[in-house]
A protein has these predicted regions:
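Aromatic-lined, polymer-binding surfaces characteristic
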Residues: 78, 90-271
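Carbohydrate-active enzyme catalytic cores, enriched for enzymes
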Residues: 198, 229-372
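Short, solvent-exposed loop/turn segments at the edges of secondary structure
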Residues: 194, 350-354, 388-390
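CBM-like, beta-strand-rich accessory domains located in the C-terminal region of large
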Residues: 2-3, 85, 143, 189, ...
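Extreme N-terminal leader/anchor segments
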Residues: 1-79
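Short capping micro-motif at the N-terminus of alpha-helices
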Residues: 78, 336-337, 368-369, 508, ...
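A short, compositionally biased
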Residues: 62-65, 318-323, 352-353, 432, ...
Length: 570
């Protein structure tokens, strides 16, 4: 951690002023003088029900029946108590509980007992939540709850007596008003978009609220244009947030058509760009590459999302605005991080993985970054975010990015953001059918006076990856006062096996039978322990190949990964 520079101090001051402005505006529109304008006309009714596109797990109902409530990778043992009275295992669990996204699992059972339980849960929540405060009334949680209740309205409102029906509809109406007055206080990024999607959906789906539709629609369009970059990536540089965004935006677009209204073009544009970027970031095993907050995920869910893009598509070769590069030859895919961290206010899950890469061959993941831990494993966050947990060079046991420790900033953004490298430049070329990437970052320049450059070259058949890592000053010659240790990490997926097969060489056996040989020229190579943080059961031990050495100011390390046993036509 290091002191803040003038630019960062100015940025924090600007964020503080913007936060105060949003809070003042929220306070103003929440006053009795203005709050009335957000109320509906008469008794609220559900006019349309959006399609639920997220996958559902009917077994969730049987778990509840046995007293277990599993959310956000944690399970609460209810012991006969209400989940709303139970002690939350974590803040993430509480947010999921009050967001009610889990209602879709009960709906998927098509069981009347499960449907009755869903209605009872909602009515109990209404009875217990008389005061609008706490986790349940964080803007993003309110937004997710509105989306969930409206999407499951057919189940929730079926066979209700007049009193219960009125209670649910009045609660929906009150929550719409609450969100319309508080959404500006949502954290920047996807939470703010979620709030606005919920408001637009509510204005379309609930009677009497459509007079504010234009206002919410304009705000949503502005956020989509600001947050979705030209190449389809999200401003946070996390690919995983886009899958959920698409699953919210697609039904929203359908709701416009159901109401006989034209959906804003920006919604379909955001969906198309997001789908294109998700295809770009998907490896051969069907999963997203693990950079900047990408955690556990389901290949089936991603495949479902990408299915909405149709069959005619061409995967981009690069995503320069988002800061990623993709090399693909034969059945081998390499995706590399060639970007700087996102803005401070949305960098709390960004990782120090400059010039790191992941690699799949056929459907097997070989080189994998540590990834971002799930909600139940946040104790590992700092380790997972460090450069040493990525497939790249780490100089003097120091990460290429730094955590920014500032109490006011942490309070505003909800965590520790990172900063640096300031400059990352890259170029992709084709050399006689070989996919080649050149990239350089300055994450070590201020502390050590050195740049880290990396060259990756993937053969036309995809059976050979050559790499060159270089440490050098930006110009001229440099002799350090003392030699600095470096380590180039190559983390293997836990399913891979690795054994030394000679000096500077090791043999990697992949789970599907492939065998690859990794070798390094004139450098010490070792096989060491590693951790894969994104396994659904928690951090999983594995192995990594590490090239270690020291630099006096200028160093070049060459390494090669080639297939010993690989049928590239399989």
């Amino acid at each position: 951690m290091s002191s803040l520079n003038v630019t960062e101090r100015f940025r924090i001051r600007s964020l503080s002023i913007e936060r105060l402005r949003r809070q003042a505006l929220t306070l103003a529109v929440s006053s009795p003088l203005l709050r009335w304008r957000y109320a509906g006309n008469g008794t609220d009714q559900i006019l349309i029900v959006p399609q639920e596109l997220r996958a559902a797990d009917p077994s969730f109902w049987s778990e509840i029946a046995h007293g277990h409530f599993g959310l956000a990778s944690e399970i609460a043992d209810l012991k006969g108590a209400s989940p709303f009275r139970a002690e939350p295992p974590s803040l993430a669990w509480a947010r999921k509980l009050h967001g009610f996204g889990w209602l879709r699992h009960l709906a998927a059972t098509e069981d009347e007992d499960a449907a009755a339980a869903a209605r009872a849960f909602v009515l109990e929540w209404i009875a217990l939540r008389r005061l609008a405060h706490g986790v349940a009334y964080e803007p993003e949680v309110v937004g997710r709850r509105l989306i969930s209740w409206i999407a499951q309205a057919n189940m929730l409102l079926e066979d209700l007596d007049a009193r219960s029906y009125t209670a649910i509809m009045q609660s929906i109406g009150q929550q719409i008003v609450t969100l319309k007055t508080t959404w500006r206080n949502a954290p920047d990024g996807i939470p703010r978009i979620t709030c606005l999607i919920a408001l637009v959906l509510a204005d379309l789906a609930v009677s009497g609220h459509d007079r504010q539709l234009k206002e919410a629609q304009v705000a949503l369009v502005e956020e989509l244009k600001r947050q979705i970059l030209n190449d389809g990536g999200h401003v946070s540089r996390s690919a995983s947030v886009l899958a959920d965004l698409v699953l919210d935006l697609l039904p929203l677009g359908q709701c416009f058509h159901s109401r006989g209204r034209k959906a804003p073009e920006e919604i379909s544009v955001a969906v198309k760009k997001s789908l294109s970027f998700l295809r770009f970031m998907r490896l051969g095993n069907g999963m997203l590459a693990r950079f900047n907050g990408v955690s556990t995920g389901s290949p089936a869910t991603l495949a479902t999302v990408l299915g909405y893009s149709g069959g005619n598509f061409e995967v981009m070769a690069a995503a320069p605005t988002s800061g990623y590069a993709r090399l693909e030859r034969g059945q081998t895919i390499v995706i590399a991080d060639v970007g700087s961290p996102p803005p401070l206010e949305i960098a709390t899950e960004a990782q120090a993985g400059a010039l790191s890469f992941e690699m799949t061959s056929r459907r097997s993941l070989i080189f994998a970054n540590g990834g971002f831990p799930g909600p139940a494993d946040h104790d590992w966050d700092a380790v997972a975010r460090a450069t040493a947990s990525h497939n790249t060079l780490c100089l003097a046991e120091t990460s290429s990015s730094h955590l920014v420790r500032h109490m006011q900033l942490e309070a505003m953004v909800g965590g520790l953001p990172i900063r640096g490298p300031d400059a990352v430049v890259s170029e992709q070329v084709d050399e006689a059918g070989q996919a080649v990437l050149h990239a350089t970052h300055d994450g070590y320049l201020k502390r050590f006076g050195l740049l880290h450059s990396r060259r990756l070259k993937l053969s036309p058949a995809g059976d050979r990856l050559e790499g060159v890592d270089v440490l050098e000053p930006p110009k001229g010659k440099l002799r350090l006062k003392q030699d600095l240790p470096y380590a180039i990490h190559f983390h293997l997926h836990p399913d891979c096996r690795c054994t030394e097969s000679g000096r500077g060489t090791c043999r990697i056996k992949v789970s599907d039978g492939q065998v690859w040989i990794f070798s390094a020229e004139s450098a010490a190579l070792s096989i060491e322990e590693s951790l894969f943080f994104v396994d659904s059961a928690g951090p999983r031990p594995g192995l990594q190949v590490v090239i270690r050495g020291t630099t006096f100011g200028e160093t070049e390390v060459r390494w090669t990964m080639h297939a010993e046993q690989l049928d590239v036509t399989a």
